[in-house]
C-alpha cells in the first residue's frame, strides 16, 4: 500500500525538494509513497487571493484565516492524521515517526506569518508538532524534515533493515562511532576491537560507546534509557 503524503502549503514548489533524491526520491519513483501538495491560495475568497488577516485584539504580524485554511485541509482525505507544524507543538521524535509511518498516510499543514487561527485546530482536530525549539520562516522546512523521517521507515525503503535498527534513538541511545578504511588517518587509528573479528567484543564496545555518548550529550535520553532498562 502506498503511503500518502498530503502537504497544505503556500509554497508547493518547495516539494519534494530534497526528498526527490536519495532514498526518499527512489521510494517516490517506485511508488512506496506518494506526494500531493495543496495550494492554500486556491481556496481564497477574494480576487486578491488573500489567506491572512490582522490578529484579533491587535498585535504584530498577520494570522492565517480559518475559512481559507480549513477549505484547503478539507481537500485532503479526512481519515488521515492531520498535523500542523508549529514551534509550540509536541516535540517530534523517533517513536512518533514510527507511529506515523505505520499509518496509511499523513496530512501536513504548513503555517506562515504570525500563526494560524486557533479555530483551525479546533474544527479539524489538528495535532501540533515541533521539530525543535527554534523559529523557522514557515512550516515547509519542518514538513520536509518530518517526511524524511517517516519515509525512510516505510517497508522497502532502506536496503538494510538492520542499519535502521542500529541508528540513533532506535534503542533509546545515540549511535556508536563509525570507522572505515584507511586503518590509520592523520595518526588516528581504528579501535583495535573493531578489527579483532570478535563479534561479541565488538557488540559490547558499541553498546558501551553508545551509552557513554548518550550520557554525555543527552542526559535526558540516558535517564529514560536507564529507567526502562531497570524495568526489564
From Swiss-Prot:
GO terms for biological process: tRNA N1-guanine methylation. Its EC number is 2.1.1.228. Its main location: cytoplasm. NCBIfam families: PRK00026.1 (NF000648), trmD (TIGR00088). Keywords: Cytoplasm, Methyltransferase, S-adenosyl-L-methionine, Transferase, tRNA processing. PANTHER family: TRNA (GUANINE-N(1)-)-METHYLTRANSFERASE (PTHR46417:SF1). InterPro entries: Alpha/beta_knot_MTases, tRNA_m1G_MeTrfase_C_sf, tRNA_m1G_MeTrfase_TrmD, tRNA_m1G_MTases_N, tRNA_MeTrfase_TRMD/TRM10. S-adenosyl-L-methionine binds at residues 111, 131-136. Belongs to the RNA methyltransferase TrmD family. It is found in: Cytoplasm. GO terms for molecular function: tRNA (guanine(37)-N1)-methyltransferase activity. One of its GO terms (cellular component) is cytosol. The keyword Nucleus does not apply. It holds the Pfam family tRNA_m1G_MT. The keyword Signal does not apply. Specifically methylates guanosine-37 in various tRNAs. Homodimer. This is tRNA (guanine-N(1)-)-methyltransferase. It catalyses: guanosine(37) in tRNA + S-adenosyl-L-methionine = N(1)-methylguanosine(37) in tRNA + S-adenosyl-L-homocysteine + H(+).
Amino acid at each position: 500500500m502506498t503511503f500518502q503524503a498530503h502537504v497544505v502549503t503556500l509554497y508547493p514548489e518547495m516539494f519534494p525538494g530534497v526528498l526527490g533524491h536519495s532514498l526518499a526520491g527512489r521510494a517516490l519513483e517506485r511508488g512506496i509513497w506518494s506526494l500531493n501538495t495543496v495550494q492554500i491560495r486556491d481556496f481564497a475568497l477574494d480576487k486578491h487571493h488573500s489567506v491572512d488577516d490582522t490578529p484579533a485584539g491587535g498585535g504584530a504580524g498577520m494570522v492565517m484565516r480559518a475559512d481559507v485554511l480549513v477549505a484547503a485541509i478539507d481537500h485532503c482525505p479526512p481519515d488521515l492524521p492531520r498535523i500542523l507544524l508549529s514551534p509550540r507543538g509536541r516535540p517530534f521524535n523517533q517513536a512518533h515517526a514510527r507511529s506515523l509511518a505505520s499509518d496509511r498516510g499523513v496530512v501536513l499543514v504548513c503555517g506562515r506569518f504570525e500563526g494560524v487561527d486557533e479555530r483551525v485546530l479546533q474544527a479539524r482536530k489538528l495535532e501540533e508538532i515541533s521539530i525543535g525549539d527554534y523559529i523557522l520562516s514557515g512550516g515547509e522546512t519542518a514538513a520536509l524534515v518530518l517526511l524524511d523521517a517517516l519515509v525512510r521507515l516505510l517497508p522497502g525503503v532502506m536496503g538494510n533493515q538492520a542499519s535502521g535498527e542500529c541508528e540513533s534513538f532506535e534503542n533509546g541511545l545515540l549511535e556508536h562511532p563509525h570507522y572505515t578504511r584507511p586503518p590509520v588517518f592523520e595518526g588516528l587509528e581504528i579501535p583495535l576491537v573493531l578489527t579483532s573479528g570478535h563479534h561479541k567484543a565488538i557488540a559490547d564496545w558499541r553498546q558501551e560507546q553508545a551509552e557513554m555518548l548518550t550520557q554525555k550529550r543527552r542526559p535526558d535520553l540516558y535517564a529514560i534509557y536507564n529507567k526502562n532498562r531497570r524495568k526489564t
